[in-house]
Amino acid sequence: MSFSERPRVTQNGPSMIHLFNVFSKFRKENDYDGLVNYLITNYSQNVKNRTFNFHNTGHIFHMLYAYVPSPSSKERKQIRLDCIENLLESTKNDFKLYEDLIKLMNGDDKCPCELITARLNDNIAYNESLKNKNFDSKPCKLKKEPIDSILFKYSINWKNSLNKKRSLPKSTTTKKSEEKENMDEIEVDASKISSQSSLSNLNGYTIASCVHDYVIEEHQLRAGDEMVSFIKFCKKCGHK
């Protein structure tokens, strides 16, 4: 189902803005148990074995985890209810992006992902036009839109990623063989070596422990598997 064909909310269901405000309240209060109870009570048909299913629910739960379309990402299909807290922690910035986009929409009752998708399609079309450009005509330009400054604020830049896809990888076989040949031809003049290198003596030094700054990131367990795990680690030293 394409983005334009996806249903927005269930028939006679709450508006997008209402859902966003509901989920926003749970986030601000860190009421994860309350959110789980809310989902079980109001969407019991989506719950099975403590797993919440997002499949065929349209845009409804984009307001929960702030789905951000990209050339490579897929929509989430399910989440373990026991992992709701980790899900909300790992999508804090995405949810702030949704907040800014809702302000930009100025009361329009639709999912922010539709704005992101429309702009992504603009970038894809522009990138395709560059690949098929006619040198006899003036190249087209991608007109700057208000959404661009918001996407830039959250480090979303498809232009660079699409350009990387557009460029073909260079063969490294020749380069490696040349490097090997060069390594074989290196000559060392022992008379010019003044002293042998050595490691500094650590005696007398004080090694300070890391002041950990932990973050939570989502990692796919296996390729092609929908199940994911949430890993907590220090941004400075990598401690888990």
Curated annotation (Swiss-Prot):
Transcription regulation recorded as keyword: yes
An example Gene Ontology biological process: regulation of DNA-templated transcription
Pfam families: Baculo_LEF5, Baculo_LEF5_C
Alphabetized InterPro entries for the sequence: Baculo_LEF5_C, Baculo_LEF5_N
Family, as annotated: Belongs to the baculoviridae LEF-5 family.
Job of this protein: Required for late and very late gene expression.
Entry protein name: Late expression factor 5 homolog
Lineage: Viruses, Viruses incertae sedis, Naldaviricetes, Lefavirales, Baculoviridae
